[in-house]
Amino acid sequence: MTNIRKTHPLLKIINHSFIDLPAPSNISSWWNFGSLLGICLMLQIITGLFLAMHYTSDTTTAFSSVTHICRDVNYGWLIRYLHANGASMFFICLFIHVGRGMYYGSYMSIETWNMGIILLFAVMATAFMGYVLPWGQMSFWGATVITNLLSAIPYIGTTLVEWIWGGFSVDKATLTRFFAFHFILPFIIVALVMVHLLFLHETGSNNPSGLNSDADKIPFHPYYTIKDILGIFLLLLFLMSLVLFTPDLLGDPDNYTPANPLNTPPHIKPEWYFLFAYAILRSIPNKLGGVLALILSILVLALLPHLHTSKQQSLMFRPLTQTLYWILVADLLTLTWIGGQPVEYPFIIIGQLASILYFVTILILMPMAGMIEDNILKMT
């Protein structure tokens, strides 16, 4: 008798996606982060749902409702900090996932890669709106500064900003709509993830060597399910250590002060995972130029398949491009540090140099290195 998982219409889909899926036999732990992102997304939706049961999206009570969750709701403090730090874990996994895609040339599966970029934008939008909800000082001023960037759009900018605000400043209407969008977007992300996986299973997974692995496939279960479970345990260990020992490590102390439109904080900055993009935005003196650079800092990823000049897909056997890749990683860490610093010398010039290096490395140096490596191989 045929196993039900292979015949049942619904179970058959799950079977082909997570059980009998043919996977390359040599994929390393860097391939764990896709499943970890799935766990993070589920965790965020579950904790977010419980928080939404007690949260009120009104400017007069939003801050108090978050305090009420932490003080009066059973394990409310745990749910709140799991949600806040879960977002940080989500972005750590996201950055590693994208970094792995860049290192091993996974961007050559163009549909999967482009879907991933759309997902990245959706997650960033969700995280930004979530940061506004506690209605602390940094929530309010972060929302004001970031939404104000749209006013740089010629002709329609100011009208667009006021339309998003629902008035002439960030107020009750803004908070209510941000809560509505923050609630619905994760479910849209789940749908996009399904499309992402659909595209992935059309071509199959890439592997560290960058070579075709059709000749050497193994079933996903039990080999990679057990490997993913180990990754999940390590992720939860790290997350729980963060939540139970230093829950405010990655937050901003200013957000424990209720929002006050009459008092601007000395340094307005977003959460740590947006600092690299914020540094690129600030490094250009022109407002519209800064906004374009901000968007391009993520959109540049869509150009990677077209900038690939090497005959080899992966960087595994390409030492020159490998060096440039790690320079890029160091550059992004520098930008993250600069984004959290005040706008003064020497941080301004460091930010500008790091921003230039970011775009030059991706758009010019890495494609050139690919061609040089190919020529060296021809000569030997």
From Swiss-Prot:
Residues binding heme b b562, per UniProt: H83, H182
Gene3D superfamilies cross-referenced by the UniProt entry: Cytochrome Bc1 Complex, Chain C
UniProt cofactor(s): heme b
Compartments (UniProt record): Mitochondrion inner membrane
GO molecular function: metal ion binding; ubiquinol-cytochrome-c reductase activity
GO CC terms, sorted: mitochondrial inner membrane; respiratory chain complex III
Sorted UniProt keywords: Electron transport, Heme, Iron, Membrane, Metal-binding, Mitochondrion, Mitochondrion inner membrane, Respiratory chain, Transmembrane, Transmembrane helix, Transport, Ubiquinone
PROSITE patterns: CYTB_CTER, CYTB_NTER
Co-factor remark: Binds 2 heme b groups non-covalently.
Keyword Transferase applies: no
Keyword Signal belongs to the record: no
UniProt: heme b b566 binding residues: H97, H196
Membrane topology: Multi-pass membrane protein
GO aspect biological process, one term: mitochondrial electron transport, ubiquinol to cytochrome c
Ranges annotated as spanning the membrane: 33-53, 77-98, 113-133, 178-198, 226-246, 288-308, 320-340, 347-367
Pfam families associated with the record: Cytochrom_B_C, Cytochrome_B
Residues the record lists as binding a ubiquinone: H201
PANTHER family: CYTOCHROME B
Family membership: Belongs to the cytochrome b family.
Quaternary structure note: The cytochrome bc1 complex contains 11 subunits: 3 respiratory subunits (MT-CYB, CYC1 and UQCRFS1), 2 core proteins (UQCRC1 and UQCRC2) and 6 low-molecular weight proteins (UQCRH/QCR6, UQCRB/QCR7, UQCRQ/QCR8, UQCR10/QCR9, UQCR11/QCR10 and a cleavage product of UQCRFS1). This cytochrome bc1 complex then forms a dimer.
Extra remark: Heme 1 (or BL or b562) is low-potential and absorbs at about 562 nm, and heme 2 (or BH or b566) is high-potential and absorbs at about 566 nm.
Biological role stated in the UniProt entry: Component of the ubiquinol-cytochrome c reductase complex (complex III or cytochrome b-c1 complex) that is part of the mitochondrial respiratory chain. The b-c1 complex mediates electron transfer from ubiquinol to cytochrome c. Contributes to the generation of a proton gradient across the mitochondrial membrane that is then used for ATP synthesis.
Protein name: Cytochrome b
Species per Swiss-Prot/TrEMBL record: Voalavo gymnocaudus
